[in-house]
Amino acid sequence: MTQQSGRIWVMGGRPLNGTAAIPAAKNSVLPLLAAALLCRGPVRLRAVPRLSDVECSLGLLRGAGCAAHWQGADIVVAGMPSNSTLPGETAAQMRASILFCAPLLARLGRAETSLPGGCNIGARPIDLHLEGLARMGAKELDAGAGKLVLAAPGGLHGTDFTLRFPLSLIHISEPTRLGMI
C-alpha cells in the first residue's frame, strides 16, 4: 500500500470480494429514524445501537403518533405521523431532534417542539437548518423562548440552496434532504 497526493493505492494480485458487517453508527441511524416519518409502510432498521439519542428518537416518533419499538437489536417504526407537536422534554435532550421537523412539515404542514438540546461541546446553532427549510417554504412562527414552531401551509418545495460554512456540522444537510422527499 502506498500513499500519493492524498490517495491511498492498494496493490495486490487478487481482486477484493466477500462481505463485511458494518456496525450501525448513531449519526447514520438518527436521520433514518426521522425519515421513517415519510414512509407509508413499516420501516425496520437492523442492528441499531442502543444509545440514549436512539431512545429519544423513538420517543419523538411515538410523540408524532407512530408506533416505534425494539425487536431484539432491530427497530420497527409503523404508522403515519398524526401529531405535529413533538414532546419538548424529549427533543431538548438531543441535538438531532431538528431532523424530525422536515418530515413533519412535509407530512402535516407543521412542526412544533422545543429547541434542540444535547451535549455541550460548544455553540451549535440551528440557523442553517432553519435557513434551508425556509428556502423550501417553511416559516418560523413566534413561539416564545425555548420553543420552535414551523409551518409550511403550501407544503415544502424543491429549491436551489448552497450551504454556507461550516459544512462540518453533523447532520447539516439532512433536514433539507428529508424535506425534499
Predicted regions and their residues:
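Short, recurring structural edge motifs at helix starts
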Residues: 19-22, 42, 47-48, 119-120, ...
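Single conserved hydrophobic/aromatic residue that forms the stacking wall/gate
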Residues: 170-171, 175-181
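The feature marks the first
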Residues: 14, 19-43, 177
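Self-splicing inteins and homing endonuclease
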Residues: 1-21, 58, 65-90, 137-165
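Glycine-rich, N-terminal phosphate-binding loop and its surrounding beta-alpha-beta segment
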Residues: 44-116
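Hydrophobic alpha-helical hairpins/lids featuring a short glycine-rich hinge
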Residues: 84-162
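Intrinsic, low-complexity N-terminal interaction/targeting segments
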Residues: 19-22, 29-30, 95-102, 159-163, ...
